[in-house]
A protein has these predicted regions:
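RNase H-like nuclease fold core
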Residues: 1-58, 63, 175
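Extended amphipathic alpha-helical interaction segments
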Residues: 49-59, 63-194, 207-218
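Non-catalytic terminal/accessory segments
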Residues: 193-198, 222
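Amphipathic alpha-helical interaction/assembly segments
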Residues: 200-208
Length: 222
């Protein structure tokens, strides 16, 4: 999994780029960067993954992440939580900003249900079947439906369902977000004054996470 965490040092925004190994259950690479543009992310991932076995990288929906991972030629999957969050936002915004008839609302509600069938199924064959059914239903074409069906769900189907191909691939990025919250809760990441302090806190908290993680693994192995 890959993600970035913003923090501000003396009023200047910085980004912690981080790569999380699901199998090891910890961060395996982290870097403080000036930006999170696709070039910076590509360089970070390329260095971090050199000579490493790569299965798939999970991220949220930022385009900078997509561009960087596509350039790496590594399989890429989207976090299901962020996908649902984005879909909910798009539908809510469209409902709020447009005068819709009850019939139009029903049609859009059905569309959302059909999309969720794809996202919530537990096997790839069912996801493909629901995708084909979505196409066959021929929902009314307008800017909104075109964008959500033909520019998101259909072209990114593989990125939405990678976790169904391999059970070792998680469907969400919850683990990396959890470690971020443990290391840098909001009240801390807004108050860092110097880079050295940030790095020191990061390594101390990460070491604590790893020790706790190792204890839990040893405990569950008996």
């Amino acid at each position: 999994m890959f993600d970035s965490l913003w923090t501000r040092i003396n009023g200047v925004w910085k980004y912690i780029l981080a790569l999380f190994d699901v199998k090891l259950n910890t961060l395996v690479s982290a870097k403080l960067a000036e930006s999170e543009d696709s070039k910076t992310i590509y360089q970070f991932l390329n260095e971090s993954l050199r000579n490493q076995k790569k299965i798939s990288i999970g991220t949220d929906l930022k385009h900078e992440y997509r561009d960087a991972i596509d350039k790496l030629k590594v399989k890429h999957h989207f976090c299901k939580f962020h996908v649902k969050q984005e879909i909910n936002k798009r539908f809510k915004d469209y409902f709020d900003k447009n005068p819709l008839t009850e019939e139009e609302k029903d049609i859009l509600s059905n569309l959302k249900e059909d999309i969720y069938k794809i996202l919530d199924t537990n096997d790839l064959d069912s996801a493909k079947r629901y995708r084909n059914e979505l196409i066959d239903k021929k929902y009314p074409k307008n800017r909104f439906t075109n964008k959500i069906i033909w520019k998101f769900i259909i072209p990114y189907f593989k990125k939405l369902t990678t976790h169904l191909e391999n059970t070792n691939i998680p469907s969400t990025n919850n683990k990396i977000e959890n470690i971020f919250q443990k290391v840098f809760p909001k009240h801390i990441k807004r108050t860092m004054k110097i880079e050295h302090g940030l790095r020191t806190r990061f390594m101390l908290k990460l070491n604590h996470w790893n020790i706790k993680n190792e204890k839990e693994k040893n405990h569950t192995s008996f």
